[in-house]
């Protein structure tokens, strides 16, 4: 009976003490250059981590029409990076290429500058 009680206590302790990954609140300011594309109707961003996803665009705000767009996204994540792709007029960039990997800075906010469909900023 004593062994059963000890086994039960140990099992209970193992079940209630789990490894929980530390989460971080990280904000990324995405700045996207779209020139020379003309007649832009909508610009968005898709990605791995909430609030982004790969099925729908998060809209980016126009800074300069047909040229410069911006979005600020806050992630609550256990990772130190995220992956994204930009979308212009329903066209996803970097087809058949890796996603953009954004490494979060040590501070709370990361500024990420990009040029649409180019791996060179």
Give, region by region, the residue ranges found by the protein language model:
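Hydrophobic helical h-region of N-terminal Sec-dependent signal peptides
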Residues: 9-13
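Bacterial N-terminal signal peptides that target proteins for export
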Residues: 1-7
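Aromatic-rich carbohydrate-binding modules that target alpha-glucans
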Residues: 36-79, 89-107
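Extracellular beta-sheet/turn segments enriched in Thr/Pro/Gly and aliphatic residues
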Residues: 101-121
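C-terminal motif of bacterial Sec signal peptides marking the signal peptidase cleavage site
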Residues: 16-18
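A short, amphipathic beta-strand motif
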Residues: 26-34
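Exposed beta-strand face motif in extracellular beta-rich ectodomains
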Residues: 80-84
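Bacterial signal peptide processing site
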Residues: 20-22
């Amino acid at each position: 009976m004593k062994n059963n009680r000890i086994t039960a206590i140990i099992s209970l302790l193992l079940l209630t003490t789990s490894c929980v990954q530390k989460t971080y609140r990280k904000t990324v300011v995405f700045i996207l250059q779209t020139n020379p594309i003309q007649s832009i109707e909508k610009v968005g961003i898709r990605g791995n981590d909430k609030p982004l996803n790969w099925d729908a665009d998060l809209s980016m705000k126009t800074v300069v029409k047909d040229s410069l767009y911006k979005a600020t996204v806050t992630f609550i994540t256990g990772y130190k990076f995220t992956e994204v792709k930009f979308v212009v007029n329903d066209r996803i960039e970097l087809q058949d290429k890796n996603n953009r990997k954004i490494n979060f800075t040590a501070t709370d906010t990361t500024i990420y500058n990009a040029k649409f469909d180019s791996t060179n900023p």
